[in-house]
Regions:
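Membrane-interface loop-to-helix entry segments
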Residues: 53-56, 64-114, 128, 169-173, ...
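C-terminal membrane-solvent junction of multi-pass transporters and transport-like membrane proteins
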Residues: 89, 128, 252-264, 298-345
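Generic alpha-helical transmembrane segments of integral inner-membrane proteins
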Residues: 35, 39, 69-77, 95, ...
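Hydrophobic transmembrane alpha-helices that form the core helical bundles
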Residues: 1-72, 77-80, 94, 221-242, ...
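Residue-level signature of transmembrane alpha-helical entry/exit and packing/kink sites
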Residues: 30, 64-68, 72, 129-137, ...
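TM-loop-TM module centered on a large, flexible mid-protein loop between adjacent transmembrane helices
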Residues: 18-21, 26, 54-58, 170-233, ...
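Juxtamembrane helix-boundary/capping and inter-helix hinge elements in multi-pass membrane proteins
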Residues: 9-15, 22-29, 156-166, 171, ...
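Helix-loop-helix junctions that connect adjacent transmembrane segments
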Residues: 63-66, 91-215, 341-344
Length: 345
């Protein structure tokens, strides 16, 4: 919700960096925040490419490195192709992805009856080990919600962003939350936890448990993770463009190809770092790093909104209560602190 209001107040590329500059007038903070957003996008894309390799294993066991290279090369080509073409591709794959999640819920629909009869099963035991496990799981699961905030980073390529951006963010959050809740119920009641633990293609395992070929959902999941990686590559390159346009990054990142109207240099740099991360780190480590950096960014973004509400008297088209960004900042700090302590144990 904080992103929705900030997108209405300050519709610019490199949104988070622009928010920090407008709120606190601190170029160093803006620069750090902008580069942190680029890092989140790049690490997140690397996580998704690893996920692609996992779902591809349902069809064939192929060497990971060549698959990753071809995958990143293809995504980079689409991102360079043009913003209109890239987003049209992303929208089409998003529709396919949503259809896949609905398919999982339908084929494992008996899980909802089990949930109605035994809803207490979804609750953890109230002991220290279980609670710590749930919080740690929530930290990693937070990664699933990363992406909605990327909408603000293409603000300058959106018509009437003051109204369109908040609406898009709210709709994205509501739809994704609803689907994730349904999938969580299905995953809890459809198959034993040990079946899903460590499974590289968990949704395929759920579908297979109901007598359907796992290849159906694995095929859809392949496109889903590619779509997520594509969006992150586009976002990271646009943030680099915004930073360079504001003098906060090398000018080369602000160069736009006259034919494709895309920042080719920035896109290539993001893709190169993405390949390096895929080679160096496993999926779970990438997801943890992404969540940690994203929570730090969200903390600052919530503080930016609180500061702007204090400084600016004009209400934007979309406005949230002050308590919302305050609660968001406190919750993000609490999750960072807990996971940091847990990591050091």
């Amino acid at each position: 919700m904080s992103f929705a209001e900030l997108g209405s107040r300050i519709p610019r590329s490199a949104g988070e960096a622009a928010y920090a500059q407008e709120a606190f007038g601190a170029p160093l903070l803006s620069t750090m925040l902008g580069w942190a957003v680029v890092a989140v996008g790049t690490v997140s894309a690397a996580t998704m490419v690893h996920g692609f390799v996992g779902y591809l294993s349902v069809f064939a066991e192929l060497p990971a490195i060549p698959v990753i290279f071809l995958c990143v090369a293809g995504l980079t080509a689409i991102a360079i192709w043009g913003i209109g073409e890239s987003l049209l591709t992303a929208a089409a794959i998003t529709a396919l992805e949503a259809a896949g999640l609905v398919f999982v819920c339908v084929v494992a629909g008996d899980s909802f009856a089990s949930f109605a009869d035994d809803w207490m099963r979804i609750l953890p035991d109230f002991n220290q080990t279980a609670i710590f496990g749930v919080v740690s799981g929530a930290f990693i699961a937070f990664y699933a919600f990363i992406g909605f905030e990327d909408i603000v980073n293409i603000a300058e390529e959106v018509k009437t962003p003051e109204k369109t951006l908040p609406r898009a963010i709210v709709i994205a959050l509501l739809v994704s939350t609803g689907l994730y809740v349904l999938i969580a119920i299905v995953a809890t009641y459809a198959v034993p936890p040990e079946t899903l633990a460590g499974n590289p293609a968990p949704l395929a395992a759920i579908v297979e448990s109901r007598g359907f070929p796992p290849g159906i959902i694995a095929f859809i999941s392949l496109f889903a993770v590619l779509n997520g990686a594509l969006v992150q590559i586009i976002m990271a390159s646009r943030v680099l463009y915004g930073l360079a346009s504001g003098g906060l990054a090398p000018a080369a990142f602000a160069r736009v190809n006259p034919r494709t109207q895309t920042p080719i240099f920035g896109t290539m740099i993001v893709a190169s770092v993405l390949l390096l991360l895929c080679w160096l780190l496993p999926l779970l480590s990438l997801a943890r790093i992404t969540s940690f950096i994203a929570l730090a960014i969200f903390t600052v973004v919530n503080l930016c909104l609180l500061q702007l509400k204090r400084k600016q008297t004009v209400r934007p088209d979309f406005c949230v209560p002050r308590a919302l960004p305050l609660a968001g900042a406190v919750l993000c700090v609490a999750m960072i602190a807990y996971e940091s302590i847990n990591f050091l144990r």
